[in-house]
């Protein structure tokens, strides 16, 4: 439902604010919102970039899903706290391996992608990390 709403809202916003059709749409978020942004990029080619700060790529089945339905965005920012994968919960501990694998796959597919490691756990500096994610996607550098 959220993706369908976005697909209707973006053209409406472009018209309302006279944004050129070739304006670059970026979707992003932190944690589960970061995972949603990555998932949305598997569903549409309307996104130029994804800013996924500490995305919940530990989610069961995500890696297999993305491999079968590749992310279509041109630019993808990924980040993770360097303590996030060090947890007793085996499902969530997969986040480190999963984000490394996603980063490698995106690079192999020719996407502009970076993986930034941040000091601390999942909840450290979420606001700053999210801002850095959007800034990287908007800068347009490899």
PLM region spans:
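The feature captures the conserved acid-bearing segment of alpha/beta-hydrolase catalytic domains
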Residues: 56-125
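Gly/Ala-rich beta-loop-alpha elbow adjacent to hydrolase catalytic centers
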Residues: 28-33, 37
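Alpha/beta-hydrolase active-site loop
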Residues: 1-16
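Alpha-helical elements of Rossmann-like donor-binding domains used by nucleotide-donor carbohydrate transfer enzymes
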Residues: 5-8, 101, 128, 132
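Conserved hydrolase catalytic core segment
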Residues: 39-48
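Short helix-loop-beta connector
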Residues: 20-23
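A short, hydrophobic beta-strand element of the alpha/beta-hydrolase
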Residues: 51-53
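Catalytic active-site module of serine/aspartate enzymes centered on a nucleophile-bearing elbow/loop
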Residues: 130-142
């Amino acid at each position: 439902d959220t993706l369908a709403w976005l697909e209707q809202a973006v053209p409406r916003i472009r018209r309302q604010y006279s944004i050129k059709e070739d304006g670059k749409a970026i979707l992003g978020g932190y944690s589960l919102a970061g995972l949603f942004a990555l998932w949305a990029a598997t569903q549409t080619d309307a996104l130029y970039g994804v800013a996924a700060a500490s995305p919940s790529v530990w989610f069961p089945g995500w890696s297999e899903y993305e491999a079968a339905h590749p992310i279509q965005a041109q630019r993808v920012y990924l980040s993770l706290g360097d303590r996030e994968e060090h947890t007793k919960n085996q499902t969530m501990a997969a986040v480190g391996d999963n984000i490394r694998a996603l980063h490698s796959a995106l690079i192999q597919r020719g996407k502009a992608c970076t993986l930034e490691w941040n000091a601390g756990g999942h909840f450290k500096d979420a606001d700053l990390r999210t801002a850095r994610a959007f800034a990287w996607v908007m800068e347009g550098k490899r």
